[in-house]
Amino acid sequence: LVEQVNQALATPTPLRIQGANSKAFLGRVTAGEILDTRSHRGIVRYDPTELVITARCGTPLTELASVLDAAQQMLPCEPPAFGDDATVGGMIACGLSGPRRPWSGSVRDFVLGTRVITGLGKHLRFGGEVMKNVAGYDLSRLMAGSYGTLGLITEVSLKVLPKPRQALSISLQMNVEQALLRLAEWGQQPLPISAACHDGECLHLRLEGGEGSVAAAHDRLGGEVLDASY
């Protein structure tokens, strides 16, 4: 990848950084020679006891999820994947977070370190692989949502979390206005809510955590239990 960037720099030729191209509908249309990152893939380091995983940019999110699942762990931000081939690099570059965003945080919040090829062909490392990395400005998190404008992400270290022991989805009948008021109220209380959506008629909630806390929250909130695949 460094060689391709340096060749483009010498020509000069604009580059279009691309993994699975599953998020091409985002942002403006770009032109340039395609630099495909999918061959630069694989898990570099993973120690479940440290809750940190390091992967190359072309690693499919499905592969990352499978490795984490084997250790009963997961990505905290639950990023949306527009296709089975969506990559780790694309997840960071686009900075999209899933339904856990209001409760767990964004993709940016869990980036510990990155390796990046700059527009001048330099392969730099920012951040590290620990949470308490406070030396200097946290440039690694700038890469989240940068859409490749700050450089080509080649490697990223992410904080991960243990999977919840229990998950339950419920449906509560109420209009949008009521749902917004309830969510604002519940957001100030220790409820194990990890996702919410409104379909026009009902508020759907996902509860995750220990068996006791999920059962207690369900007893308090009520609602119809939804199919586990919801």
Identify the role of each PLM range.
Residues 21:
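Short, basic/aromatic recognition patches that contact phosphate-bearing ligands
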Residues 93, 112-230:
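C-terminal substrate-binding/cap subdomain adjacent to the FAD-binding core in PCMH-type
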Residues 31-35:
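Short, well-ordered secondary-structure micro-motifs within conserved domains or adaptor modules
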Residues 1-17, 37-84, 92, 96-129, ...:
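N-terminal glycine-rich flavin-associated loop
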Residues 24-29:
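Short glycine-biased active-site loop of nucleotidyltransferases that positions the nucleotide triphosphate
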